[in-house]
């Protein structure tokens, strides 16, 4: 059995904390460790911030989409998507310290953080169509989902 949640919200920076807390609340039913929960919250924060700042270039007309799937074996799958400007070169964007917004004091560590905290990460992006992140984490001692 699996459990799924879908969420969409305006691409406003104040909605980043809403997304982070909502995803964390949903995941708690698997009883993750505090470290695992913190890592997932950080990843959601980084991904949503990237969508808002880079994908939509802070244009609040955009929408961020999140899907969370919890599997009975303790696997958490996240899909975070925007319909923004896309990433021209994903490999370059994933390099530590790479940023397209140095004037906004961006550290360029978002993808590096996501790769370190998740077991799997896949990025699909098309210029002028948007970016989708697929992320997966295996929780260590999670509870089975209730039937």
From Swiss-Prot:
EC identifiers of the protein: 2.7.11.1
GO molecular function (one): protein serine kinase activity
Keywords: ATP-binding, Kinase, Nucleotide-binding, Serine/threonine-protein kinase, Sporulation, Transferase
Catalytic activity, reaction form: L-seryl-[protein] + ATP = O-phospho-L-seryl-[protein] + ADP + H(+); L-threonyl-[protein] + ATP = O-phospho-L-threonyl-[protein] + ADP + H(+)
Source species, domain of life: Bacteria
A GO biological-process term: sporulation resulting in formation of a cellular spore
Function: Binds to sigma F and blocks its ability to form an RNA polymerase holoenzyme (E-sigma F). Phosphorylates SpoIIAA on a serine residue. This phosphorylation may enable SpoIIAA to act as an anti-anti-sigma factor that counteracts SpoIIAB and thus releases sigma F from inhibition.
Sequence similarity: Belongs to the anti-sigma-factor family.
Official protein name in the record: Anti-sigma F factor
Gene: spoIIAB
